[in-house]
Amino acid sequence: MARYTGPKSRIARKFGEGIFGADKVLSKKNYPPGQHGNNRRRKTSEYGVMLAEKQKAKYTYGVLEKQFRNLFEKAASANGITGEILLQSLEARLDNVVFRLGIAPTRAAARQLVSHKHITVDGKVVNIPSFSVKPGQIVGVRERSKSLEVIANSLAGFNHSKYPWLEWDESSKVGKLLHIPERADIPENIKEHLIVELYSK
């Protein structure tokens, strides 16, 4: 399955929430897309509910099925609560950390910045969006990229105290992952236990 590149409002309406951020269309059309969307609210099977939750997580973090499955398998083999570890692994992805630091306005934009070699980790360019950032590592903007309009606009007025597991130095345009976030601190509306149940079937 390729990464979805179509209208984000369509996906937001599918799940009934703005999984990509604030969505003006969703506030007007809070029902599934399609010709009969306003009349299509129907009971979903147990499997359908679990599958939808997995899709929501994949769309939210912009992860493909193979990557998502690999992250789940690693989480399942680790000590701790599988669903929480899965979300923590998604939060540790470099593209997500770039987004959380306010360097990019969306995760999709963050992926582009990483892929186009605008982002550094501990001073070295890393162009792999799925790179897992470890606590203590420094994520920054490459010197020649600091004047990019998309970065400047995204950082302007961004509240860097939103996420207590991250630290930001405005003067040098670098951030640090202080620690892996607790589940209660992760703001995404994802029922990870349903994903665990789906993969356990």
Swiss-Prot record:
Residue ranges of every copy of the S4 RNA-binding domain listed in the record: 92-155
At the top level of its lineage, which domain of life is listed?
Bacteria
The signal peptide, as residue positions, is: none
Q: Which GO terms describe its cellular component?
A: small ribosomal subunit
Q: Which PROSITE patterns match?
A: RIBOSOMAL_S4, S4
InterPro entries per UniProt? Ribosomal_uS4, Ribosomal_uS4_bac-type, Ribosomal_uS4_CS, Ribosomal_uS4_N, S4_RNA-bd, S4_RNA-bd_sf
Task: Name the keywords, alphabetized.
Answer: Ribonucleoprotein, Ribosomal protein, RNA-binding, rRNA-binding
Query: Which Pfam families does this UniProt record tie to the protein?
Result: Ribosomal_S4 (PF00163), S4 (PF01479)
Instruction: Return the similarity comment.
Output: Belongs to the universal ribosomal protein uS4 family.
Summarize subunit and interaction data from the UniProt record for this chain. Part of the 30S ribosomal subunit. Contacts protein S5. The interaction surface between S4 and S5 is involved in control of translational fidelity.
According to UniProt, the name of this protein is Small ribosomal subunit protein uS4
Give the organism the record lists.
Phocaeicola vulgatus (strain ATCC 8482 / DSM 1447 / JCM 5826 / CCUG 4940 / NBRC 14291 / NCTC 11154) (Bacteroides vulgatus)
Classification of source organism: Bacteria, Pseudomonadati, Bacteroidota, Bacteroidia, Bacteroidales
Q: Which gene encodes it?
A: rpsD
